[in-house]
Amino acid sequence: MWQFAQATTGLADACLELGIPVTGGNVSFYNQTGENAISPTPVVGVLGVINNVEHRTPMAWAGDGDLIYILGDTADEFAGSEWAHLQGHLGGLPPKVDLPAERLLSEIMVAASHEGMITAAHDVSDGGVGVAVTEMALRANIGARFWIPENIDPFVFLFSESTARAIAVIPGTEELRFSEMCAARGMRATRFGVVDSGLGVNSGHPGEQVIV
């Protein structure tokens, strides 16, 4: 029960910081089996409005040569992650919650979308960057080339579920404007891939690459 109470307190803190209304929710303590408590994960409903649905940002990338960025900082945080679940691993650090950074990320993504800079985007909360780009490639049926940024362990980069991060795909013509906007707001933006339908797009990166 303590874990559940802490989870709802965290939800309240996040709603206040981000200005998000919760329209409904559900949890049943009658689902407890024997001595095993239910997971402290309430289900909540949140309503969002897009003023013009034609301006929505899809998950699937489309343009050959479009640049793939990861926004935010990645840390060695695997407790409670999909990797930990699949490996049956207990231990390590859970992703640290940074609500001001989450708000900043949301503001940047919305602003960039309104300005027509972003052609696709995806969260990395369910499996990390590696899972996210695979889902984007499968949705688009178009591959891409990737490289691991310097000064970070490849495993951490691909599978960490650090918060306040998102993948943004932009046309090459928007790279300068997008980078300057992120820098001006204090958001790290790291280019780590390029969309490649198989025509041999030059990634512009000399290091070892992975093709998805």
What is each stretch, according to the model?
Residues G48-N51, K96-S106, F146-I152:
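A general structural motif
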Residues D76, L99-E102, S197-G200:
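Short C-terminal domain-edge/linker segments immediately following a structured domain
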Residues M1-F4, A12, L16-L18, I38-V97, ...:
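Mobile "lid/hinge" segments at catalytic clefts and subdomain interfaces of large enzymes
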Residues F4-L18, T23, V27-P42, G91, ...:
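Glycine-/charge-enriched secondary-structure boundary and capping motifs
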